[in-house]
Amino acid sequence: MDNLRGVAGLAALAMLAMTGLMHAGQIRDALEPAASTVRIASTQANDALRLAMGGQGGQKSAPVAEPDPQLAMTTDAAGRLRDKIPADLYPYFDVYLYVSKAAEGALAQHLYIFHKDAANNLVYEENFPVSTGRERHERYFTSTPVGLFELDPNRFETSHYSRTWHARMPWAMFLNATIHGKQTGVALHSSGNAHAVLLGNRASGGCVRLPPEKAAELFHRFQKEEQGMVPVFAYDSTHNRTSGDGLIVRDSSGNPVLAPGYRVLVFIEDYPGGPALVAVVA
């Protein structure tokens, strides 16, 4: 999908800001008073919103009759993040990656990037096609795991080689998780030129393949800008894996146990995308 551009893009972002603010109000009601809320916002969106609503004496402009499909998808992805992430995780992460591993649908096989600004607003950056697992039995079941994940600070590799698939995994950023009792081999990494044509389809052995230029960009960005102390995710013995719901380890005083990592939170789910949202400025 192309990024939002020009006046149409600003109007779309304005409606996105309105939607985010409504969700933020709901979040505030649900969370404890001291908790920060996260909503969709941007300076451009606020400027466009003022233009759309009219700046003179509260006068309003003509209705916007055609909602932007990109807006609907971005709002949907942001809403899924808001609903999934526990409030006590927000202070520890700056970048949020949403991945839909669905085979079909508006959000399917795409990664959406959001970052948190100084006011704790969740700001949309961009989205692009990816390839997740083929979801079938091969050498093993080629499934991409779902849930909330941190990135493993000890497994950022510019050129990893998979002995299982006898394939290179450039710019590999492994998930920091134990699944089925062992450290996962699932990573976000470059598709490489040979598999780039398959982006937007289920095509991997379980990893999340990214466009080559995006994999390199995120790899360097996270290493340069996002290192910090993050919560240690708890182990879910019922499902024999690291918690995918964002449950964290706490000490005897109830404080989160922190460890060096990346302030990046990844949410992967099998969700195709909801119906198009109708947003009208009346």
Model regions: which residues?
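Generic hydrophobic, helix-prone segments enriched in Leu/Val/Ile
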Residues: 17, 97, 218-221
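Surface-exposed beta-strand edges and flanking loops
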Residues: 53, 99-101, 132, 267-270
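N-terminal hydrophobic or amphipathic segments with adjacent small-residue motifs
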Residues: 11-14, 141, 194, 200-201
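Feature targets compositionally biased, intrinsically disordered low-complexity regions
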Residues: 5-8, 19, 24, 53-57, ...
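Exported/periplasmic cell-wall-interacting domains
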Residues: 157-282
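Generic detector of solvent-exposed, compositionally biased contiguous segments
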Residues: 53-81, 143-150, 222-248
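N-terminal secretory targeting signals
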Residues: 1-85, 279-282
